[in-house]
Regions:
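C-terminal catalytic/motor cores of large multi-domain enzyme assemblies
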Residues: 1-171
């Protein structure tokens, strides 16, 4: 998501309706939704654009642990420019994430399930079983046009489909 936000700066932006000013953020600060016994908290991964995938994974684990153990500090909860919520952690396939103003967008990650899909193998259509995941994206239409939203999601989809996450995570 950090890579996609760098590639699509209007999604990593905010709009102030009082001043009618748009702010394009140079830092990608991603809030992650964490389910805790006291309710949902959204700690922030600051400057995610400068982190490797293993560093981001480590930050997610650390922030989630701090959130669940009531150890977050005020700085851990401020400065988000975008939010990611994992609706799939409870098995949900679809949801409509609610935008957190002044952020321009929030991305949901649904449950990953095997699905039959049509693939092209050697010029022939075939049915294959693939891991599939819906990525519901809610955005502020004052900041992000529908076509831009589509390009942003396509960037994420392409990264998910072509990445070697085992190598990226050094597994």
């Amino acid at each position: 998501t950090a890579e996609a936000l760098v590639s699509h700066p209007n999604v990593n932006a905010s709009y102030n309706p009082e001043t009618k000013e748009m702010t394009y953020h140079s830092d990608v600060n991603i809030a992650i939704a964490v389910d805790t016994p006291k309710g949902l908290l959204t700690p922030v991964i600051h400057k995610a654009q400068d982190m490797t995938l293993p560093q981001i994974a480590q930050q997610i684990a650390e922030l989630a642990d701090k959130a669940r153990n009531n150890k977050l500090k005020p700085n851990d909860l401020t400065g988000a420019t975008f939010t990611v919520t994992n609706i799939g952690s409870e098995g949900a396939m679809l949801d409509t994430p609610i935008l957190v103003p002044p952020q321009a967008g929030i991305l949901g990650t649904a449950a990953i399930e095997k699905r039959p899909v049509v693939v092209n193998e050697n010029g022939q259509d075939a049915i294959a079983i693939r891991q599939m995941c819906y990525l519901p994206f809610t955005y502020d239409h004052q900041v992000v046009d529908g076509a831009d939203a589509g390009r942003f999601i396509t960037t994420i989809k392409d990264r998910l489909q072509t990445a070697d996450f085992q190598a990226d995570l050094e597994v």
